Amino acid sequence: MMRIALFLLTNLAVMLVFGLVLSLTGIQSSSVQGLMIMAGLFGFGGAFVSLLMSKWMALRSVGGEVIEQPRNETERWLLDTVRRQSQQAGIAMPQVAIYQAPDINAFATGARRDASLVAVSTGLLQNMSRDEAEAVIAHEISHVANGDMVTMTLIQGIVNTFVIFISRLIAQVAAGFLSGDRDNEGSSSGNPMVYFAVSMVLELVFGILASIITMWFSRHREFHADAGSARLVGREKMIAALQRLKTSYEPQEAGNLMAFCINGKSKSFSELFMSHPPLDKRIEALRSGEYLK
């Protein structure tokens, strides 16, 4: 990472704010071509705003503390492990953070492969063996090395563009129809309140439905991150880490970082909206070597 992830929520919020500003100021495109250009600018804008703010938002949301100087043996081990694995993966040393949480979890984020952040919960450090913790860290390092955040941003930008475009196109038609406006250029000169209400509702609804696409991508990348971890530290360590996760309870990152957290349990949504495949499927994929080929 279905519980809408922080990345998706931020995109949705940016899209709605842009839509509100456009509607209130009357800055509305007068043609389909203009609408598409506007949708593209704002659609990708929302995605890249989320990407650029990702480290700050992630640390703020969990109360994470970046390790500047290790204060104990555990922090030294954590820094050494991240440094070693990042060198193996061919990326720059990420920032490393710890956050207070009883559950076993970790996440990676950042705008670039060489400017990333890896954070782990205190629950992970306390309840996992060193081998299992190494596998989880390698999973997050693999997310960074694979460029998953940037790829997610590009996919989200495309999805945002179509959500904004289709929502506002329908809103223009609805506003014109209800006001009796038959502007051949598709102008939104109809009822402005109808245009505003319809476009806001549709952007919200289509944005949630479009998360099916981004969640499919997230699930796909989880298999590859698991495989990346297996290459860095060994298949059995990653399998052991996933098996340990099966015994842990539901993570408490409250829907905010699930798209890139290691723990992907979900009971509230169907698999279409899950950011992670079920743990059993991930274990089976590792055992079969499907993503290691």
Curated annotation (Swiss-Prot):
GO MF terms, alphabetically ordered: metalloendopeptidase activity; zinc ion binding
- Name the membrane topology term: Multi-pass membrane protein
UniProt organism field: Yersinia enterocolitica serotype O:8 / biotype 1B (strain NCTC 13174 / 8081)
Which sites bind Zn(2+)?
139, 143, 222
UniProt EC number: 3.4.24.-
Q: For this UniProt record, give its keywords in alphabetical order, as a comma-separated list.
A: Cell inner membrane, Cell membrane, Hydrolase, Membrane, Metal-binding, Metalloprotease, Protease, Stress response, Transmembrane, Transmembrane helix, Zinc
Q: Which gene encodes it?
A: htpX
CDD domains, sorted? M48B_HtpX_like (cd07335)
Protein known as: Protease HtpX
Which cellular component terms (GO) are annotated to the entry? plasma membrane
Which InterPro entries does the UniProt entry name for this protein? HtpX_protease, Pept_M48_protease_HtpX, Peptidase_M48
The active site is formed by 140
User: Could you tell me where this protein is found in the cell?
Assistant: Cell inner membrane
